[in-house]
């Protein structure tokens, strides 16, 4: 049979997806984290893989789903949080713009799965299934109550789940995980479609969302999930030493306040007394597209006058950041290769060919 007749849509998908194959899985497994450091990789949206000097591996908010894929239904889902926020009826054109850089079914070495909250782009049934099927049978699933309810509903045993709320501390090998207050007001209006938010006092944030501080032997990482800007960041900065802080950044559409702006990201870094602040989430949704260079430009304008003690870092999905080795870098670039050029004799018609 000819190739053009044997190839199907299914064979095409299996041969190209996930786009990075197991490349990043292998890179993470092979990484030897030096003493006094920690390494992390951006998995897209707010997904992070963190690896300590002791070889402890945890993932946070690793999501393997998609956004809109069809114009079929022109209307937003009734009762959606964005509909509640802005009184809209039209479908939100949020298409996923980031490739899948990590294969969940190629994960073998992992010590904990975490989620900050239960929004679809922060917790994933495929990740849960892959870990349950292919990894050690004692890997815990850690998150606020709403996340644990989801995991249990998907079939993760209750005894594998750990509910956390602000103030709780969970030890995973050489990483100490502190659950802290979250400031995700959008989470408070994520309700059943038939439940009204107008005129009703929201229930507590603590069951719905948490921020995390990861204390490793080589430094600390603050993961803010989908939190908006809050004055309370300063309290977290007073109470904890924070080396690297991650904040959800995006260009909010008209009538919407769901992501931090460039000014908010700088205020967050200052309030937390962080050394490095890194925006994320701006990569994933087409309708929240934002240029992180805006953060750096604003930082340059303000840093001397306001005596900032932190630097911004502009990352790329799938890229690695190592603390403290990368603390003075401003931007990430994927490895360019060709570092071994001219280690063998070139095969050219003549030397001046190039």
Curated annotation (Swiss-Prot):
Q: Which GO terms describe its cellular component?
A: cytoplasm
The GO terms describing molecular function are: L-ascorbate 6-phosphate lactonase activity; manganese ion binding
Q: What is its main location?
A: cytoplasm
Give the subcellular location. Cytoplasm
**CDD domains given for it?**
UlaG-like_MBL-fold (cd16284)
Its top-level enzyme class, in one word, is: hydrolase
Q: Which UniProt keywords apply?
A: Cytoplasm, Hydrolase
InterPro entries, per this entry?
L-ascorbate_6P_UlaG, Metallo-B-lactamas, RibonucZ/Hydroxyglut_hydro, UlaG-like_MBL-fold, UPF0173_UPF0282_UlaG_hydrolase
Q: Give the pathway annotation.
A: Cofactor degradation; L-ascorbate degradation; D-xylulose 5-phosphate from L-ascorbate: step 1/4
Q: Does the keyword Phosphoprotein apply?
A: no
Q: Which cofactor does it need?
A: a divalent metal cation
UniProt catalytic activity: L-ascorbate 6-phosphate + H2O = 3-dehydro-L-gulonate 6-phosphate
EC number(s) stated in the UniProt entry for this protein: 3.1.1.-
Give any Pfam family that matches.
Answer: Lactamase_B_2
Stored Gene3D superfamilies:
Ribonuclease Z/Hydroxyacylglutathione hydrolase-like
What conditions trigger expression of this protein?
A: Induced by L-ascorbate. Repressed by UlaR.
The similarity comment for this entry is: Belongs to the UlaG family.
Its function, per the record, reads:
Probably catalyzes the hydrolysis of L-ascorbate-6-P into 3-keto-L-gulonate-6-P. Is essential for L-ascorbate utilization under anaerobic conditions.
Name listed for the protein in its UniProt record: Probable L-ascorbate-6-phosphate lactonase UlaG
Lineage here is: Bacteria, Pseudomonadati, Pseudomonadota, Gammaproteobacteria, Enterobacterales
